[in-house]
Amino acid sequence: MTPSIDALRDFRASTCNLVGTPTVTNDLSENIILTSLDDLHNWARLSSLWPLLYGTACCFIEFAALIGSRFDFDRFGLVPRSSPRQADLIIVAGTVTMKMAPALVRLYEQMPEPKYVIAMGACTITGGMFSSDSTTAVRGVDKLIPVDLYLPGCPPRPEAIFDAVIKLRKKVGNEALRERGKLLPTHRYFTVAHKMKQVKPIITGTYLRAKTQQNALQAGVALPVDFKAEALPTKVILSNSLSLDN
């Protein structure tokens, strides 16, 4: 009678004395994680980004919607801070003017390293619709501080802000401690210690007295102007409800 396969398997297991996986190894693999110092440091930072909210226009309203329960941005570890010395991320949302530029630069310089910047909205990235007519709007916040991530839109939706935060977390996770000194900006367009050179006002009207404009002005003066106009009938209403017609 030929034994069954199950019987052979049981006989082999009882006589061969197979060496199994040690229980100590299983316990260690479930309680110890092997990683590098860079990965551990980056994991701790990307899971606890503390943003400093710098909102000057309508883009900040969209970011304020993230605080509500519908989007719940706390799940990303974002804890808004009111002090730049406790923040490692600044989100610039809205138009930046020349008068607000020193305040923005001072806030950035007060943040500890490593620090990151998200430019949110078209007005922050390029100046937006205000840059065409306004002479005081900064045409790009990257002229003041280095930007790590650009978030276009007018304004961006809250879902786009989440996507920007996720991309920034990926960037933080790929950094190395040895390369941190090489990633610092080497040139700054504007700093707090920078002294602006005062110049004369641009709009003074002196260009009309230039020689290149004299021919056009003389041609305009020679044009006849008709000041004669027929008198239009007027009607005067008095306080005693009487009217006089001319």
Curated annotation (Swiss-Prot):
Which chemical reaction does it catalyze? a quinone + NADH + H(+) = a quinol + NAD(+)
Write out the GO MF terms: 4 iron, 4 sulfur cluster binding; iron ion binding; NADH dehydrogenase (ubiquinone) activity; NADH:ubiquinone reductase (non-electrogenic) activity; quinone binding
So where does [4Fe-4S] cluster get bound? 58-59, 123, 154
Write the signal peptide boundaries.
none
Where is it localised?
Plastid, Organellar chromatophore thylakoid membrane
Instruction: Quote the InterPro entries the UniProt record gives.
Output: NADH_UbQ_OxRdtase-like_20kDa, NADH_UQ_OxRdtase_20Kd_su
For this protein, the record's PROSITE patterns field holds: COMPLEX1_20K
Which prosthetic group or cofactor does it need? [4Fe-4S] cluster
What function does this protein fulfil? NDH-1 shuttles electrons from NADH, via FMN and iron-sulfur (Fe-S) centers, to quinones in the respiratory chain. Couples the redox reaction to proton translocation (for every two electrons transferred, four hydrogen ions are translocated across the cytoplasmic membrane), and thus conserves the redox energy in a proton gradient.
Q: How does it assemble?
A: NDH-1 is composed of 14 different subunits. Subunits nuoB, C, D, E, F, and G constitute the peripheral sector of the complex.
Q: What is this protein called?
A: NAD(P)H-quinone oxidoreductase subunit K, organellar chromatophore
